[in-house]
């Protein structure tokens, strides 16, 4: 197996120039069995025989160290993850247990599942799993929680009823929701991103037709919650035509350009005459990247069109990429999780510079949903659930080189990393025999978890900080 495309995008490429792929030897294979034993998670949690099998190889740089067990229902459906290194906490939108799971990133102990409202939001609760009445599968468009993001004491979670749930993490126990704000839609509020100061939040209603994003005021470092809607953002219908189930996906905030960058899986006429769903047969249109300046949006609604280089706003056309995930890495580079789940011809992952729009394709890794840049080791981590050959955790360094891939349970699409300890958290679904449609159809997850209930796998990349060069931007809010 080979990896390709080392590309220092900042300054190395001329405007519009595409990086040339170069072959590099794979740094580590991923087929050896694990040699790691069980690790006790907490005094109240029994040790389990975790980190075995294909998902825990002993010859990779990224090592499986334990599996955190989630009390309650086996994990059938979950969505986005987030880490707050300042609070030493990991958060997971856990639909199976109708809440947001919290794990301590230092002790690796399960802390709680936040499920309901405080006195300030009596009756507030998450939707949980909603099933498709015809197929029995999870209805992703109406289930929740979905996307999560945090700043300081405030955790924000999108829900299946098109609401933004605001959680005060300083409130102990399971009932910490203090506010619920509707986007006005009828389907889930999905992935989201915060500005670095935590005062603005952009969330995507990916399942609406046409899809839209909402810009909210957020709480920053304030002591009380006052979240409200500012603007509903749609994309010009010539770019995202209504009536075909097209979507927008993961936003990311770049503090240098002061823009939100939101992945768009499929856009019309990219290239001209392509199929975005208006024709029979496979999708052939590539995706786009929506660039949003929150200071110039009209209210209460705004429509964004084609990319305008003079304002650095609008939809950038992508090549050979229909992305889901988006994350900001070093030098204002964004890694986009291209996936054959959007365009069957996708075989790579894309890195694009936020300023120049120069780009490079990374070979031998595709199919990502959530992607995350970890400043602690200057690496991207990819939840590649639609990877060719089966779900993997992808590891790409800050110069756009694929380091390794590690097998994961089927549908393992969520990932977040703790930059303080370089621990990577990857939730695993329970086996299909336990939870039904949507469960793990391989034995990989059970080997990682040590149980048949699913878990949150914890990987670690040990770094010599005296020699490591980090990216120059702190991994920020999504």
Question: Model-found features: residue ranges?
Answer:
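Intrinsically disordered, low-complexity segments enriched in glycine/proline and serine/threonine
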Residues: 5, 20, 26, 438, ...
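Bacterial N-terminal signal peptides
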Residues: 15-16, 23-43
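N-terminal secretory signal peptides that target proteins for export/translocation
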Residues: 1-22
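Predominantly soluble domains enriched in secretory-pathway, periplasmic, or organellar proteins
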Residues: 45-478
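Exposed boundary/loop context
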Residues: 4, 9-11, 30, 42, ...
């Amino acid at each position: 197996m080979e990896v390709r495309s080392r590309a220092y995008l900042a300054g190395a490429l001329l405007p519009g120039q595409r990086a040339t792929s170069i072959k590099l030897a794979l740094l580590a294979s991923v087929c050896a069995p694990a040699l790691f034993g069980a690790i006790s998670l907490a005094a109240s949690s029994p040790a389990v025989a975790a980190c075995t099998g294909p998902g825990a190889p002993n010859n990779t740089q990224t090592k499986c160290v334990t599996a955190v067990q989630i009390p309650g229902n086996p994990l059938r459906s979950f969505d986005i993850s987030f880490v707050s290194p300042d609070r030493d906490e990991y958060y997971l939108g856990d639909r199976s247990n109708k809440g947001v799971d919290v794990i301590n990133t230092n002790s690796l102990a399960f802390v709680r599942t936040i499920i309901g409202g405080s006195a300030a939001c009596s009756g507030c609760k998450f939707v949980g799993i909603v099933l498709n009445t015809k197929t029995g599968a999870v209805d992703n468009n109406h289930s929740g929680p979905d996307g999560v993001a945090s700043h300081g004491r405030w955790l924000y979670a999108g829900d299946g009823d098109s609401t933004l749930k605001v959680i005060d993490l300083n409130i102990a126990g399971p009932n910490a929701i203090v506010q619920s704000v509707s986007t006005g839609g009828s389907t889930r509020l999905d992935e989201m991103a915060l500005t670095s100061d935590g005062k603005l939040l952009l969330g995507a209603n990916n399942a609406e037709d046409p899809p839209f994003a909402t810009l909210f005021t957020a709480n920053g470092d304030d002591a009380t919650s006052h979240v409200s809607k500012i603007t509903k953002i749609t994309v010009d219908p010539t770019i995202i035509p209504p009536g075909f189930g097209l979507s927008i996906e993961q936003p990311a905030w770049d503090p240098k350009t002061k823009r939100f960058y939101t992945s768009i899986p499929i856009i019309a006429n990219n290239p001209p005459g392509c199929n975005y769903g208006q024709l029979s047969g496979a999708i052939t249109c590539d995706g786009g990247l929506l660039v949003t300046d929150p200071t110039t949006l009209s209210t209460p609604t705004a429509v964004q069109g084609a990319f305008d280089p003079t304002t650095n706003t609008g939809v950038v056309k992508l090549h050979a990429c229909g992305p889901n995930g988006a994350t900001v890495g070093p030098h204002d580079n964004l890694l986009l999780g291209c996936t054959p789940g959007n365009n069957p011809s996708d075989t790579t992952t894309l890195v694009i510079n936020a300023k120049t729009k120069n780009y490079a394709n990374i070979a031998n890794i595709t199919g990502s949903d959530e992607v995350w840049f970890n400043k602690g080791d200057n690496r991207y981590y990819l939840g590649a659930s639609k990877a060719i050959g089966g779900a993997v955790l992808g590891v790409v360094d800050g110069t756009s080189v694929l380091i390794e891939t590690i097998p994961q349970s089927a549908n393992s699409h969520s990932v977040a990393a703790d930059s303080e300890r370089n621990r990577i958290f990857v939730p695993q679904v329970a086996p299909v025999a336990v939870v039904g449609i949507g469960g793990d159809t391989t034995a990989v997850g059970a080997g990682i978890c040590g149980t048949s209930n699913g878990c949150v796998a914890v990987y670690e990349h040990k770094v010599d900080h005296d020699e490591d060069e980090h990216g120059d931007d702190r991994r920020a809010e999504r």
